Amino acid sequence: MITVDRDGKRFGNEALSYHDFGRQMLDHHATEQEVYAWIIGDKRLMDKYGIGYAKPWPVPRGFFHRIGFLHMGRSIADLAQNSGVDPQGLERTIERFNRDALAGKDGEFGRGSTAYNHFRGDMEHTPNPNLAPLAKGPFNAAKEQMGDIG
């Protein structure tokens, strides 16, 4: 899973707390009218974890596609087009992220480099429990907006 802006670029460590990641999101979008990002996942992620309200397999996800909560694409380019994200930016971001995930080190934002990150990871995944390539479609995206978590 990665989170990207409308240009298809990551802007922070997605394994941080909601508060810290929210701060990164606000800082990154400081000059923009609307603060939002896209959570991107592949088939493996959707089947094992889901995204937000869209729960993992075997829970059907058609409803979430119909109401616009989830956007789907058979390829990264399709997903970008269906969600309004820059296709070239998203392709480049996922290529870099996948290389880093296979190597087990997030060269951009250090995801998986702290005990807190590891606690929020999947210990069955190695070499870094916080990094897995986004490799197999269909790919899904959900719009993420700032909110109050209590």
What does each of the following model-derived ranges do?
Residues 1-85:
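An anion/pyrophosphate-binding glycine-rich loop and adjacent beta-alpha core
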Residues 89-150:
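A glycine-rich dinucleotide-binding beta-alpha-beta segment and adjacent secondary-structure elements
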